[in-house]
């Protein structure tokens, strides 16, 4: 079994999504979350949990949240898994 190498909680700002056409905003938010985690966790292999996707799409494609709190875990093989962080 692969062990967790690094675990971190991030608050990811999604304010730049407002610059995207309204019908593409949720897709852009998912890409921003993935890109943010790739940059900060230094890995190209990022897997997002279903709960993140459901939160971003909860109000439809035109109104994603302004920020999202995520717990990211990097494993020894370089894969990053992200899930919603409990408060």
Swiss-Prot record:
Instruction: Tell me the PROSITE patterns matching this sequence.
Output: RIBOSOMAL_L31E
CDD domains, per this entry? Ribosomal_L31e (cd00463)
Q: Name one GO molecular function term.
A: structural constituent of ribosome
GO BP of this protein: cytoplasmic translation
Q: Which InterPro entries match?
A: Ribosomal_eL31 (IPR000054), Ribosomal_eL31_CS (IPR020052), Ribosomal_eL31_dom_sf (IPR023621)
Q: Name one GO cellular component term.
A: cytosolic large ribosomal subunit
**Pfam families membership:** Ribosomal_L31e (PF01198)
Q: Which SUPFAM superfamilies match?
A: Ribosomal protein L31e (SSF54575)
Q: Which UniProt keywords apply?
A: Ribonucleoprotein, Ribosomal protein
The family assignment reads: Belongs to the eukaryotic ribosomal protein eL31 family.
Q: State the protein's name.
A: Large ribosomal subunit protein eL31
Gene name, Swiss-Prot/TrEMBL: rpl31e
């Amino acid at each position: 079994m692969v062990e967790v190498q690094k675990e971190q909680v991030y608050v990811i700002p999604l304010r730049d999504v407002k610059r995207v056409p309204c019908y593409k905003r949720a897709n852009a938010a998912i890409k921003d979350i993935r890109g943010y985690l790739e940059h900060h966790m230094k890995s190209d292999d990022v897997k997002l949990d279903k709960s993140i996707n459901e939160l971003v799409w909860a109000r439809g494609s035109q109104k994603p949240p302004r920020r999202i709190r995520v717990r990211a875990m990097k494993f020894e093989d370089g894969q990053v898994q992200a899930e919603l962080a409990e408060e």
